[in-house]
């Protein structure tokens, strides 16, 4: 099954939309619109009458943004959107272990926003780094298994770090682990224009892999705001 975003450019880059059974990684710098991109799929998945489980490890809740994008209060959405908020890396792992218990028949989308936030905080203690790498790999593997075994689309948002070669580009946190599990990898970055973002499909290779999006209150659009007037 394909879950479209409702934005033609995004769906073309993803070969129609999010594929169920697949693990999609989205990474980008701060304010690039990773959460908005994820919520774009939440909104459209609800329109298709399917459900979403949204695991939020960020310090801010996606509720206000979701209400802004849909123009309706969350109470009108909660029959199709379940938001869960772990308080630490180990709690996140325990929640991912139990996700299968929350998969009702209509759930087709699982979003983790972001998988690596608590992981990065744990890395401050160098004595536990190996265990933290192993735990992140375990969590990603469970999510990939859920996607495959339950025919779900899993979207994992990821933070970034500067590349070691010293240019101004960035790479995803825990790149080797995330590359191993990801079927699709999408990169978002802030461009020069107001609300302008660059989206690129890093993998798999293929035609039509990048484009420009514009961030609006209602979500992403592929048309410049002044072109829509």
Residue ranges and their predicted role:
Residues 12, 23-26, 185:
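A positional/architectural concept
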Residues 16-18, 44-48, 73-76, 101-105, ...:
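Conserved catalytic network of the ASCE P-loop NTPase/AAA+ motor domain
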Residues 19-98:
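Conserved P-loop
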Residues 89, 96-177:
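P-loop NTPase motor core
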């Amino acid at each position: 099954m394909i879950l479209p975003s409702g934005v033609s450019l995004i769906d073309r880059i993803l070969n129609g939309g999010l594929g169920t059974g697949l693990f999609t990684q989205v990474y980008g710098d701060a304010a690039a619109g990773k959460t908005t991109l994820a919520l774009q799929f939440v909104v459209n998945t609800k329109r298709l009458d399917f459900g979403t489980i949204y695991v939020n490890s960020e310090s801010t809740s996606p509720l206000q943004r979701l209400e802004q994008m849909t123009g309706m209060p969350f109470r009108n959405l909660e029959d199709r959107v379940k938001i869960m908020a772990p308080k630490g890396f180990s709690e996140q792992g325990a929640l991912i272990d139990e996700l299968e218990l929350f998969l009702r028949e209509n759930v087709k989308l699982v979003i983790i926003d972001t998988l690596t936030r608590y992981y990065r905080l744990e890395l401050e203690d160098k004595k536990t780094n190996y265990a933290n790498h192993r735990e992140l790999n375990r969590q990603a593997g469970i999510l990939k298994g859920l996607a495959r075994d339950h025919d779900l689309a899993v979207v994992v948002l990821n933070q970034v770090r500067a590349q070691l070669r010293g240019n101004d580009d960035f790479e995803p946190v825990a790149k080797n682990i995330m590359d191993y599990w990801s079927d699709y990898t999408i990169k978002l970055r802030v461009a020069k224009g107001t609300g302008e973002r660059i989206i690129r499909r890093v993998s798999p290779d293929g035609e039509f892999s990048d484009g420009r999006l514009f961030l609006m209150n209602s979500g992403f659009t592929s048309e410049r705001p002044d072109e829509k007037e």
